[in-house]
Amino acid sequence: MKPFKLSLAAALALAVSSACAAPVVGPADDSFFTNPAPTALTGPNGDLLSYRVATVNLGAGATAVNAWNVIYKSTDSRDRNVAVSGTVLVPKAAWTGTGARPTVIYAVGTHGLASGCAPSKQLALGTDYETANIKAALAKGYAVVVSDYRGALAGATSTYLAGKAQGNAVIDSFRAAASVPNSGISLSAPAGIWGYSQGGQTAAFAAEQLSTYAPELKIVGVAAGGIPGDFFKTADYLNGSIGFAFLGSAIVGLGNQYPGQLPINLLANDEGKAALEKISTQCVFQALFENQNTNIAQYTRNGITLEELLAVESVNVTLDAQTLGRGNISVPMYQYHGQADEFIPLDQAVGLKKAYCAKSTKVKFDLYPSEHIVTQFQAAPTVLTWLADRFAGKTADSTCNTTAADPKPTANPGGGDFIVSLKSWPLNAAVGLKTLGQTVLLPATSTFTADANVTAQTLRGNLNVPDFKQTLKIIGLPIQVGLKIVPAGETTGSVSVDNAGQLKIRGTSPVDITVTSVLGIPFGECKTVSPVQFPLSFDGPISSLGNGALNFSGTTSFPLIKGCFISAILSGLMSGSGQTYSLTVSPPAPVKF
């Protein structure tokens, strides 16, 4: 019997080897992103089909990485075998923490339905709008795995917002990454899943599926923000709003995943079919800007309303299949949402938290003060700290037992312009006085309030600086000077976001500067004879709105100071050209719920 056992073992090994053939090195050109034949999809989920060394552009200051593009086997929401692409990023520097290097499985948000919008292609070009979050994870020394989801390969179609398929895709991206030669990624090392918006939905679906789809993986925590967990409420929220493109994209993506269940050709009119076809060719920002405030009744035969569409049984069943909160999550969860989110309704996110808490999931929920895009990037430091604690094996805290009332949304009304409201955002500011060679730090309680209207491309707001005292060295002596900085008019300018997610701001903030006292002696109206103009100029990724990188700096001129008997002295010390300034604006801190 012994020889038979050896033969059986050999046969089993041969079977496994045949089912999971060695991955091939793919071509260097775009033909790499070709959908493999169905016969290649016979291995286990996460089977690495092909890979290649990749070049990525993460921008200035990024951690040096080794990178690979991968194509791997996964399953979609109908349990069919599919091929999915992605990118694997591993810092070149050795991991200096305890144990093996952890991995962040990064689930991207909406990128657009066209294959050219895929993260793998955007990371190569240096145009991926989520680069800031990926860079932040790499800076911690973590490996980062990014799935493109279904649809980036030639011959494949996007299954946008098909939750089960997306959850499977990110889980299998981690499995595939561990098979990349010399990646150093280990399936036995701790890993965390992080996603926002579409990525938040993906992360939550992956978490619900872990115990059955990937019980062998050491996933220690899931961070999911801006989650569309209730598609019925989310669809109603998006319809007729600035975020209609997400609803239109969902119709296309779910129609691809569930052909026949969303009878688009039967329900859409010619205008609707053309609009959905165009959305299929666009990346996220172009689709967003070109489809604002559309009502789905414009695109349906006989003006069928959203409510009537959702009553169609096959449509209802399809959307219901994307509902979260019904599965158990066995790992800690960090959930977060923007109180002013204009795309994903807050109440259904709160409901999802309660559903998970009721199933004994350990959920920590943070409420961020701003809108959807800002929150995505503002939350990154907190997410990474939370994940670091999970990787370190620390006990996760929970806000499931909060007695606080449900938070109320503060989003700008739907159906209007796309406005990012900066309500009393902390202002970290400094002014450099050229003649004195010294820097004046504005009070830590200074704030900036503005409405950045991306639709109208206008910026309107004001600085708020409390009166303060600053010690300056004058002729070598430390002298305390009282200062008042007040708006001399509204901060005005222009703001725009291009199709690549690049933010551009141009404007001016005029202020009057008054010297209120010297050595404690009050001087009344000893102020600049005309307003000081602080030019506001910024060019950078839209992530800067949330991650603290929104900075306006440069040089300006201070007019003469008049109104008191030492005006001439103060003018000599503080007036003239070449004065420098730095104004950094960041959103307020979140609150627990």
Where are these regions (language model features)?
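Short beta-strand/loop motif that positions the catalytic acidic residue
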Residues: 193, 329, 334-341
